[in-house]
Amino acid sequence: MDEEHNIIMVTTNYIPGKKITRIIGTIWGITVRSRGLGGNIVAGLRSLAGGEIKEYSKMLSDTRNTAMERLRDAAEQVGANAVIELRFDSSDIGQVMTEIVAYGTAVVVEDVSSDIQRVGLS
């Protein structure tokens, strides 16, 4: 859980110890990044030798983080305190840009009382 935003984000369709009290709907965070000419040249040279292209790995990691931040912001804007079924998608736009989308279902969750948990585990 992100303490700054207090938004729970999971890839599952449930959150252990929580019950979904309201389903708000699909939300997403999108970002598009340009690889840039310099990055393309360095990546092209590195691809000749094989192995990881660290410039692209860092760019994609940073881009995913930005998409996640935007997804958290979207959750807050619609009044959600959790996102379930979190997924990522990516695509190239032209030959120099990459789009990353983080999406999921915005929900409101509450703690499950200990009595309900005991009944469910019996």
From Swiss-Prot:
| InterPro entries associated with the record | UPF0145_dom_sf, UPF0145_YbjQ-like
Gene3D superfamilies, from UniProt?
Hypothetical protein apc22750. Chain B
* Pfam families, sorted: YbjQ_1
> What is the similarity comment for this entry?
Belongs to the UPF0145 family.
Name of this protein = UPF0145 protein TV0671
